[in-house]
Amino acid sequence: MAVSFQTKNPLRPITNIPRSYGPTRVRVTCSVTTTNPQLNHENLVVEKRLVNPPLSKNNDPTLQSTWTHRLWVAAGSTTIFASFAKSIIGGFGSHLWLQPALACYAGYVFADLGSGVYHWAIDNYGGASTPIVGAQLEASQGHHKYPWTITKRQFANNSYTIARAITFIVLPLNLAINNPLFHSFVSTFAFCILLSQQFHAWAHGTKSKLPPLVMALQDMGLLVSRKDHPGHHQAPYNSNYCVVSGAWNKVLDESNLFKALEMALFFQFGVRPNSWNEPNSDWTEETETNFFTKI
């Protein structure tokens, strides 16, 4: 049995196929609807973050003392006390009083001279790259631009480098020498040198912030005064180097001793002191108000 399938309309050939195959462009339109979620204030969590406070004259860590600073000051003070004890014990044993007293006075006088020579040297020679003492040279020379910072430094921060040097110098002397006159001189000299940076800081202080005793000693000429020392911070920055009593400043400045030493070093080694250079922004004083305004 044969079955035949017939359609009403017979099949026709497809003749409407496009001959070119160009790209088809389709335009799609998207719409986005946003909704504002309702905040649940009860579930909000505030995360606490530690934020560094802005730098100020009261929290600058470079002006604060560390335990290392304090230990060096304690070590230096101990060696000075040991030297002074030897002078007292020796004085009792030998029944000498006038000579040790004169030796103490000589130590005080020469401490002022020593502070001036040292201050002149570190102000004029070397810099941050100088081995061993580079950091101290940089701080001393930078003091001309920011002189007021010395009044913000804590005592041990301001004095530990001197105390460290005193420890290494005076300790061997204590062990090797017992002469009471020698120790009268050494203990007084070292004591004044140890405190010289504090005397220096007081010379930059305002009258309202200084203890009455300090002001009295300054007025008597026993400590470097607030009136005389500021001349050191005026161009050409080549005077008033002594910072214990300041008694040697007039002698050294009028005799031109430091200028003669500078000439000798220049002709011998070809090294120019900083005081010969034209004043620039590195040495021009910037006031405390202007400095903290920039921070």
From Swiss-Prot:
It is found in: Plastid, Chloroplast membrane. GO terms for molecular function: oxidoreductase activity. Keywords: Chloroplast, Fatty acid metabolism, Lipid metabolism, Membrane, Oxidoreductase, Plastid, Transit peptide, Transmembrane, Transmembrane helix. It holds the Pfam family Lipid_desat. Its main location: plastid. InterPro entries: Chloroplast_FAD_CarF, Lipid_desat. GO terms for cellular component: chloroplast membrane. The keyword Oxidoreductase applies. This is Fatty acid desaturase 4-like 1, chloroplastic. It comes from Arabidopsis thaliana (Mouse-ear cress). The gene is FAD4L1.
